[in-house]
Amino acid sequence: MDEANHSVVSEFVFLGLSDSRKIQLLLFLFFSVFYVSSLMGNLLIVLTVTSDPRLQSPMYFLLANLSIINLVFCSSTAPKMIYDLFRKHKTISFGGCVVQIFFIHAVGGTEMVLLIAMAFDRYVAICKPLHYLTIMNPQRCILFLVISWIIGIIHSVIQLAFVVDLLFCGPNELDSFFCDLPRFIKLACIETYTLGFMVTANSGFISLASFLILIISYIFILVTVQKKSSGGIFKAFSMLSAHVIVVVLVFGPLIFFYIFPFPTSHLDKFLAIFDAVITPVLNPVIYTFRNKEMMVAMRRRCSQFVNYSKIF
């Protein structure tokens, strides 16, 4: 009888970020600039690494794949978010929501594991430089990449297993600009406290475990270098600085989200914007800004593109 009195929800409504037209315009400009910058920056890294024979090394192979992950991650939320800014009814189908959740968690999990692989690459380069190319051979690099994607996809499938069979009978409003899984689950017609806890625990585990492994790895590298040479620690820290900054950018919002005792809608939205729009732009900037070899290669690639354009 109860089921007959409820209609099954087939689409969800995003409440968005603001109803003010002026703020919407500012957000449109802000998100558009950052999204286009993210696309151009990460694509430039991928094209530069794949086309320049001087950059055919394990470090740049992993960096190019991180850029691909950034492209997929920001494209899973940013285009719809920009498209919805001026729409009165910001809707998404149940299937669209499931697809968005899958990509967000699959790519996010893959990125975390790939950062661990990049930390291992730095460990070998700094602590075992003579054996670097032997240890970080092409087969091992591909293995790292495959394992990263497998773990990311498994993590995402586990998350989806909690929600694909849920019944949604109303309300259907999400106080967000994308399919935020914890908020999505709360709209189900059943008691969702336990389910929400399991989903949060799954994401929290992979995030915290990856973060701890990375921090321990960086500390181990610095301690190892310190034992060999007191002066070498500054060079090691210089080589690791970009990686540490990226780790803070990736994991900072996640850790703050999980440990902050009084989460709010505004805080969650800010962290989501930072993670989805700003971080994918900063990653290529941070990794290339202090890398002279990469900067020279990117300038060379841009010059070739400009010269090619002039011909036509």
From Swiss-Prot:
Glycan-bearing residues: N5
Main subcellular location: membrane
Transmembrane intervals: 26-49, 58-79, 101-120, 140-158, 196-219, 236-258, 270-289
Keyword Repeat: no
Molecular function, one GO term: olfactory receptor activity
Cytoplasmic side: 50-57, 121-139, 220-235, 290-312
Gene Ontology cellular component annotations, sorted alphabetically: plasma membrane
Keyword field: Cell membrane, Disulfide bond, G-protein coupled receptor, Glycoprotein, Membrane, Olfaction, Receptor, Sensory transduction, Transducer, Transmembrane, Transmembrane helix
One Pfam family hit: 7tm_4
Membrane topology according to the record: Multi-pass membrane protein
Disulfide partners: C97-C189
Extracellular side: 1-25, 80-100, 159-195, 259-269
CDD domains xref list: 7tmA_OR4-like
UniProt subcellular location: Cell membrane
Domain of life per record: Eukaryota
PROSITE patterns in the record: G_PROTEIN_RECEP_F1_1 (PS00237), G_PROTEIN_RECEP_F1_2 (PS50262)
UniProt function note: Odorant receptor.
Similarity annotation: Belongs to the G-protein coupled receptor 1 family.
Official protein name in the record: Olfactory receptor 4F6
Species: Homo sapiens (Human)
Gene symbol of the encoding locus: OR4F6
